[in-house]
UniProtKB/Swiss-Prot annotation:
Catalytic activity, as annotated: tRNA(His) + L-histidine + ATP = L-histidyl-tRNA(His) + AMP + diphosphate + H(+)
InterPro entries: aa-tRNA-synth_II, aa-tRNA-synth_II/BPL/LPL, Anticodon-bd, Anticodon-bd_dom_sf, His-tRNA-ligase, HisRS-like_core, HisRS/HisZ, HisRS_anticodon
GO molecular function: ATP binding; histidine-tRNA ligase activity
Gene Ontology CC: cytoplasm
GO BP terms in the entry: histidyl-tRNA aminoacylation
Gene3D superfamilies reported for this sequence: Anticodon-binding domain, Bira Bifunctional Protein, Domain 2
Protein known as: Histidine--tRNA ligase
Subunit structure: Homodimer.
Entry keyword Ribosomal protein: no
Protein localization: Cytoplasm
Amino acid sequence: MANIIKAIRGMNDCSPTDSPLWQWIEDKVRNVLASYGYSEVRMPIVESTPLFARAIGEVTDVVSKEMYTFWDNDEQLTLRPEGTAGCVRAAIENGWIYNNEQRLWYMGPMFRHERPQKGRYRQFHQAGVEIFGIANPEIDAELIILTARLWKELGIEQHVSLQLNSIGSLAARAGYRTALVAFLENHQALMSDEEKERLLKNPLRILDTKNEALQEVLNDAPKLLDYLDDESRQHFTQLCALLDNMGVQYEINPKLVRGLDYYNKTVFEWVTSALGAQGTVCGGGRYDGLVEQLGGHATQGVGFAMGLERLVLLVQEVNKNISVPNAVDIYVVFSGEGTTLAAFQTAEKIRSELPHLRVMTHCSGGKFQKQFKRADKLGAKLALVIGESEVQTDRVVVKDLSGAVEQQTISVVELIDYLKRVF
């Protein structure tokens, strides 16, 4: 027997057993976004490498260590590590945002060369939202309120909390960076080699260190909120006031900076303690300079992305009462001369008249008992039984697989009305 080829480490399959929960979560996401009037866009998985270097920042961990990059003739290409840069590129290239507000969303796989662990994978999936052309803090609030609504839809609202910060303008961060570096230089003995490298290249990233000794020291470090420019401070104050009035609870986290260089003003994360180390389920913020940085007209931007794998894990962990639809509602079983055509015709009639129902026809033969076992395994609610006598009398036997209702025989003419009452 030949050696079995396995999936790449950190890139996982989604089984028929798992996919209904994924679909349920994705449908919830789509429905909430639709209720706010947002429009779906779809971008390529592969983009030009310089797009991410310019957008995310060359000294970030994502660009310097984690991207899957390859050469195609003389062009360097990268599997997208996140969605914002590609969405901004598409918006500029296709003229979606020229003198125009846009509220866009997307969903799909992203790729980062990280050490795989629970909740962190090399291929992972995100749902992202990007808003263009709106400067006011009201739209920041809408994004946060939208995500809060989604958590309720998923039944996880009691297990996530909102962390909020403002990182101000580029000029304000430059002043803060100088003060932070001056403070941290006295504590290099506590730092790993990686943290010392960050101190030189991207010192704000030290604020979210997992080094407990350094975390303790950072409690006395200068606070970014004390260095904000007046515009950023006013923006943040108005955002917090609106969230307060809308009843959205949050914690101001002065160490929250996010890991990508394009952010300014508002940054936020929804976090959970139910998933261990991988506690961030959604994160985002403003990026008012990114469109111009990538060659477009000056356009304000704000958005977020949520990890679908982490949402799946969180829903499985905390929402034990979830009711995910089965793959099959009705299983059509048949045996005997002339029953195949009748079974197929009956199944097609149901699909035409009741398209919301999932109908499967048994196609692998065998006795009725074997067919019923298959229907049970698939979680079907009803089995429709067609034998030779049913074909001759133009009837069908309806079997409730839960045993709650007695088996009964009804005419094919009455079948659709019967199913409407059941489903």
